[in-house]
Amino acid sequence: SDTEAPRLSQYAYGEDYHFVLKWKLKELLKWMRAEWGDIGGRVYVDSAPILERAWARQSGLGWIGKNSLLISKKKGSYFFLAEMLLDVDLEPDAPVTDHCGTCTRCIDACPTDAIIKPSVVDGSKCISYFTIELRGAIPEPVKGHMENWMFGCDICQEVCPWNRHATPTAEPRFSPHPRLMDMTNSDWEDLTEDIFRDVFKDSPVKRTGLLGLKRNIRALRQESE
């Protein structure tokens, strides 16, 4: 709608993926137990110190791109990772070879130079860190480089050639809140607690909270002045 409105990372438009993926994995575990008997298993969605990208690469799901994200030939990098630990042996697929080649689009496009070398992101320079995890004020040197992102950042994915043919998800819980798609720049400027609760009721944006989001919006306004 409003092309000047602040931007959200695409994963944040629908329900929080932590809840959706955990529910899906628990349902899968129920099915496996019904089929195979009483097997032991636990599911994790960002809730344990598991090197998920490394294990995903080893399992043949994709390769780790220069933007540090897992990339699949079929899906690009627009997908989530979650894990299920089981006490049964499963035969994995073979690891996938790197297909980034000489491409450096993600490195060249990052406005804060957060990708310090291929496959290595300095989190303390990443727009996603500043707009989601940071609890203080946005540093002055960062203002002017946020590229209109108020929550997260997708730049290194948007420029990736492997995402050219990415398709929308079929999962209805990841569909955007209807009100969210119509919000204008002025709507975001005047964001109230009631609107925030309505639009982001089950959203990962709750991690930043209303005050954090308004801080980010103020920083973006200062960029444009």
Specify the residue positions occupied by each region the protein language model found:
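Alpha-helical packing segments of well-folded alpha/beta enzyme cores
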Residues: 24, 28, 106, 213-216
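Long, well-ordered alpha-helical scaffolding segments within enzyme catalytic domains
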Residues: 97-102, 111
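Iron-sulfur cluster-binding cysteine motifs and their immediate structural context
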Residues: 105-129, 135, 148-173
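Short Fe-S-cluster ligation motifs
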Residues: 130, 134-151, 181-206
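Amphipathic alpha-helical blocks and their helix-capping loop/short-beta junctions
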Residues: 168-183, 188
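Long, compositionally biased charged/polar accessory segments in the mid-to-C-terminal portions
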Residues: 198-201, 206-224
